[in-house]
């Protein structure tokens, strides 16, 4: 892994390593270390798994909880602080469900895909031949290993861990019912337009200091608020403008910059519709086409449920139901072939989502 690759990864995850060997280790699979010696990322995965649980619970308590009393602390220049009992807007079951969604395998794997960093995995020959980097479990492991490496490199700096988790995971998409997830929209647009993901550069800034405002590019700027601590510059392949957003965290700054980019694309009539994504909707490719739309953020990964019955002659008949979390409709396929039943259910669902648009 060279310096250019390390810089790209650090820009994407929103953290700069003091000890870059930890970052390289986070990307090193056991298959490589078995063949070449050195340390792999398995212990970092273990550390990152525990760190992820902690920072996600911390985030949930901050987003949905508050204390029963407030007071002004005059020893801190009248700063408003909280005390008393802790009150949560969500109950234990609701918090547990959100946490479960945030830390599950598919969520972490999707985050690695959105960051575009699985390509940099360091693998042994067997893993390379099997294209193991495409495995959901491997991407999940990579996410946890990176967070574990950050935990060690930062000496367990909770703010650094939470910051990086927010940048990598974008948890607001699951915690809040936003009309538009600007980060995901821009990532999907860039991938569809150029095959590449946007680049993110983060800079510390404050009302007391000098705002980060690059002058060497055409830029569109967000609005800086009083409690702003970070700037994020988003660069989209094929777009001349750079977009600079501000926020009290790196994640909020990235969201602001992505919003600016989204509004620019919308004003320029450059946004794709769901119909633009699939050139030729057809029965034979329907399963893959439906998954492409899901991977690009239009809806969740389709779920297929199968049931085998038999006709009067005892021949197998397969029934397949296709459902999508965000859609009320369930489509059905029926065939003597399990694969064809799945295709029929997928094609009917594909037709439904395209017509719905």
UniProtKB/Swiss-Prot annotation:
Reactions mediated catalytically: Endonucleolytic cleavage to 5'-phosphomonoester
EC number: 3.1.26.3
Key words, A-Z: Cytoplasm, Endonuclease, Hydrolase, Magnesium, Metal-binding, mRNA processing, Nuclease, Repeat, RNA-binding, rRNA processing, rRNA-binding, tRNA processing
Domain DRBM: 198-267, 285-355
Enzyme class: hydrolase
Cellular compartments annotated: Cytoplasm
CDD domains according to UniProt: DSRM_SF, RIBOc
InterPro entries associated with the record: dsRBD_dom, RNase_III, RNase_III_dom, RNase_III_sf
Protein's GO biological process: mRNA processing; rRNA processing; tRNA processing
GO molecular function terms listed in the Swiss-Prot or TrEMBL record: metal ion binding; ribonuclease III activity; rRNA binding
Gene Ontology CC entries for this record: cytoplasm
Active site: 49, 144
Residues involved in Mg(2+) binding: 45, 141, 144
Organism superkingdom: Bacteria
Cofactors, names only: Mg(2+)
PROSITE patterns recorded: DS_RBD, RNASE_3_2
Coiled coil: none
Protein function: Digests double-stranded RNA. Involved in the processing of primary rRNA transcript to yield the immediate precursors to the large and small rRNAs (23S and 16S). Processes some mRNAs, and tRNAs when they are encoded in the rRNA operon. Processes pre-crRNA and tracrRNA of type II CRISPR loci if present in the organism.
Complex and partners: Homodimer.
Protein name: Ribonuclease 3
Species of the source: Roseburia hominis (strain DSM 16839 / JCM 17582 / NCIMB 14029 / A2-183)
